[in-house]
Structure formats: C-alpha cells, structure tokens
Amino acid sequence: MGAGSSSYRPKAIYLDIDGRIQKVVFSKYCNSSDIMDLFCIATGLPRNTTISLLTTDDAMVSIDPTMPANSERTPYKVRPVAVKQVSEREELVQGVLAQVAEQFSRAFKINELKAEVANHLAMLEKRVELEGLKVVEIEKCKSDIKKMREELAARNNRTNCPCKYSFLDNKKLTPRRDVPTYPKYLLSPETIEALRKPTFDVWLWEPNEMLSCLEHMYHDLGLVRDFSINPITLRRWLLCVHDNYRSNPFHNFRHCFCVTQMMYSMVWLCGLQEKFSQMDILVLMTAAICHDLDHPGYNNTYQINARTELAVRYNDISPLENHHCAIAFQILARPECNIFASVPPEGFRQIRQGMITLILATDMARHAEIMDSFKEKMENFDYSNEEHLTLLKMILIKCCDISNEVRPMEVAEPWVDCLLEEYFMQSDREKSEGLPVAPFMDRDKVTKATAQIGFIKFVLIPMFETVTKLFPIVEETMLRPLWESREHYEELKQLDDAMKELQKKTENLTSGATENAPEKTRDAKDNEDRSPPN
C-alpha cells in the first residue's frame, strides 16, 4: 500500500526471561501502562508489579510506545522493582481511570484514523485517475497501430484514380492527449440559474468559460453519472470539438454554445427529463454541440452549385450536415475523446443513429417536410410512440438551431449582423465565380429588417406555435419574444422605407434643379444679346 501503511505496523521488543528469548508485539497506540502490563504477563509477574527494563549493558530503558526497538541478539532484561499494594477502592478508582483513559485514547485514535483514511483516499483517487489515463493512452496506442496497419495495407493495394476530387479526409482533428489545461471555472449560483434560461447572454463569455458551462451541463443533467463518462475524457472531447469549429462570422463555436445552451434551457423549461429517457437527453445535448462541426461558412446551395468535394461525396444530399456528422464521429472514434466508452455496443448504436437523425434534421431544405410530419403527429401525439418522439426531438433541435430571436433583443440582434456578414461573403464569392445568387444573401438587395421579417413570420413563429401545443409554457417564454421581434423589425422596415422615399425625393429635386440650371443660363444670354447697346 506504500509508505502510508507503515504507521500501522506494530513494534516488536525482545525480552530475556531466564535465558529464554520472548518476543512481545504491541501497536503505537498502546500507552506505557499497557506495555508494562504486557511485559509483566510475558515474564510471569503480577500485572501491578513495577518493573524496569535494562539493556545488555544494564542501561535503563523507558517503557513507552517510543522505546527503541531491539533484536534477538540484544534482548532487554526485565527487573521487578516492587509490587504495589492497592486497596479495593484504589483498584476501583484505577479501573474507572483506566476506562476513561481508554475512551480518550479511542477518541484520539479515531481522529488520527480519520486523518490517515482521508490521506489514503486522496492517494487512491490520484492513483485511480492516473490508471484511467494509462488506460486511455493504451487504447489510443492500439487505435494508432490499427490505423497504421490499415494504411500500409491500403498503400500496397492502391491504384491511381483519375478522379479530380480527393476523397481522403484532410481535416486535421486536434484532440488533446494531455490533461486539458483550460481552467475549471467555478460557476456562481447566479450563473448556474441563468444558464437554465433562454434569456442567457451568450456574448459575455470567453471560449474557456463556455467550455466550463458545457461541462457543467453534462454533470447537472446527470449524464456523466448515468453513462459513466470519464470527466477527463469529457474535457478532452469538448476541447477537440472547440478546435474543430472554424472562425466564421456566424457558424462558429459560440453558435454551437448558443444552440446547446438553448437545448439545455428547454430541457429544464419543458421538463424534458420527465418525457424522454436519459439516452434521449444525451443525444439531444451531444447533437446540439456537434451539429455544425467544421462548417466552412458557405451553405449547401453553394456546395452543390460549385460542385465542391462535399457535394460530390454526399451526392448533393445535405452535404454540410453529413459532413458535420462525419467529423463528430471521427472525434468520438479517438479513445481519448470517446465520451461513450462505457456505453454498451447496442447503446452506442442507438446514440449514433439518434445523433445522425437530429443533425441531418437541421438542413433547412427539409424544414417543410419535417414540419408537415410533426403537425400530422400532433393531432394524436403519443409519448410512448418512438416515431412521435423522434419527430419531437428533430423539432427541438431545429428550434434551438434557429432560436436567436427568442433571446432578448440586445443578445439576438448581433447574431443578425454576423449572419448577414457570412451571407455577403458567400454572395460575393458566387458573383465572382458566376454562380446563382440568392436575393436574401445579396448585399445589394437585402437589409437587416427584410432578412428577418419573413424568417420570423413564416418559419420561427409557426414552428414555436406548434411546440406550444405540447408545452404551453413555451408561449410566454419563447413565443412572445418572437412576436416582439417581428414588430421590432417591421417598425425598422417602415423607417428604412421612409428613409428611402425621402432619399428618392431629395435625389429627384436635386436632379430637377440641375436640369433647369442650363436653361436659365441660356435665357439670360439671349436677353443680353437682344438688349440695345449703350
């Protein structure tokens, strides 16, 4: 057990009793009286005999727990000094005192034992953590060796392919093999409470703080406990996910956090843990975190029109969403990032299928199809029906994915600027490459107000109204902010229209004044020519 166990080791003393060597063993918790009684018993003397202990050279030895140990070659000699004559009363008093002393001794022993047990537990926890790291590293080495063997076999059998597209995955995943170094923030009670609400301000937090918030969500929902997720693996996985979001204006790690936080708030707001299994909650949260992994900043329309590698690979069918799924499971395939390592194979199959279904549902090209199916099931919604539950989960992740306008205006509006910036980057590229440009992405045709009004009115409000039928609490918390947002952008559009009308009138007046100026000049010149000379 290590050095810590030496404190429990008993002490052995050797006595010379009439030429016979007697070994006496006692623990460090014995007092002097106990040891003296033990020596008396060993030498056949009465227990109340006062004795002295002598070394081989007749030096006296103190009889107490700290007395120096000896060996069989250097035994101590026991010399009786006197036999105490005690009265019955004194014996009774001594007995009581002995019992009191024993109780005190036990109390002190308990405190000492508590301290030592605490130290041992700390040592064991550290050892378990180190052993866990070793297991992860061993699994990583096995995986690396397997991949190297497969690569060698593939190289031996590889032939030249005339295809212009490379189907090798050149994306560099960056899991952390060491223990993650981002600081573990202690979230205040106020932050923990705010984190459960849709009004949470996602702009106030740095990436490390967002990672700590995500980590807290998995612990708070009981997912770490129920699926035996290694906390170190959870942190590695979150770091790797963070590193595989690009620095796009909109589709970045903050958007990932925003969507996941909204999912987390809906779990608490709608009491989803009462409706879904813990595996469903795990799928919802993990799909939300992974739903836009490695997003390039250009949507599916661009991928298909530009015939990119992703469009070719996935046959124009939700190329981005398929790519997000692929990256998610490439990360999870690495032992040091596999948060599902303790989940049985059948459970992992269900989790994988669930995540794929939800991430593919975030393709807005499928919005009408999914909404129609959900509305059909809403007439007789059955929580015991797996198909109904799957559709509800698809709607939930869709709500969270496009939920910015549910948040307070000061939190939501900056996201519109980010989205338009990404749209304009794409439309500029489409123009330069001679590809079709969507009007809602063209910087020459769209404004913030026009971009939002139609989206809120025809996409967001109908979807959240449908969810409200199952969860009435959503109306006040999430639907009402959408109505207010619609009114805000309609007022903004009226102001924009008024400004355009005023600008148009100003331009007309300026243009008219410019055209009339030459005519007046010509008339003045003609009058001057007609006037008589002086």
Curated annotation (Swiss-Prot):
GO terms for biological process: cAMP-mediated signaling; cGMP catabolic process; cGMP metabolic process; negative regulation of neural precursor cell proliferation; positive regulation of cardiac muscle hypertrophy; positive regulation of long-term synaptic potentiation. This is High affinity cGMP-specific 3',5'-cyclic phosphodiesterase 9A. Specifically hydrolyzes the second messenger cGMP, which is a key regulator of many important physiological processes. Highly specific: compared to other members of the cyclic nucleotide phosphodiesterase family, has the highest affinity and selectivity for cGMP. Specifically regulates natriuretic-peptide-dependent cGMP signaling in heart, acting as a regulator of cardiac hypertrophy in myocytes and muscle. Does not regulate nitric oxide-dependent cGMP in heart. It holds the Pfam family PDEase_I. 3',5'-cyclic GMP binds at residues 251-255, 292, 401, 423, 451-452. Its main location: membrane. Mg(2+) binds at residue 292. Residues 500-534 are annotated as: Disordered. One of its GO terms (molecular function) is 3',5'-cyclic-GMP phosphodiesterase activity. Pathway: Purine metabolism; 3',5'-cyclic GMP degradation; GMP from 3',5'-cyclic GMP: step 1/1. It is found in: Cell projection, Ruffle membrane; Cytoplasm, Perinuclear region; Golgi apparatus; Endoplasmic reticulum. InterPro entries: HD/PDEase_dom, PDEase, PDEase_catalytic_dom, PDEase_catalytic_dom_sf, PDEase_CS. Zn(2+) binds at residues 255, 291-292, 401. Residues 175-496 form the PDEase domain. Gene3D superfamilies: 3'5'-cyclic nucleotide phosphodiesterase, catalytic domain (1.10.1300.10). Widely expressed in brain: highly expressed in the basal forebrain, cerebellum and olfactory bulb. Expressed at highest level in cerebellar Purkinje cells. Its cofactor is Zn(2+); Mg(2+). Homodimer. Residues 517-534 have a biased composition (Basic and acidic residues). Specifically inhibited by BAY-73-6691 (1-(2-chlorophenyl)-6-((2R)-3,3,3- trifluoro-2-methylpropyl)-1,5-dihydro-4H-pyrazolo(3,4-d)pyrimidine-4-one). Specifically inhibited by PF-04447943 (6-[(3S,4S)-4-methyl-1-(pyrimidin-2-ylmethyl)pyrrolidin-3-yl]-1-(tetrahydro-2H-pyran-4-yl)-1,5-dihydro-4H-pyrazolo[3,4-d]pyrimidin-4-one). Binds 1 Zn(2+) ion per subunit. Binds 2 divalent metal cations per subunit: site 1 preferentially binds zinc, while site 2 has a preference for magnesium. Tightly binds zinc. Belongs to the cyclic nucleotide phosphodiesterase family. PDE9 subfamily. The keyword Nucleus does not apply. The lineage of its organism: Eukaryota, Metazoa, Chordata, Craniata, Vertebrata.
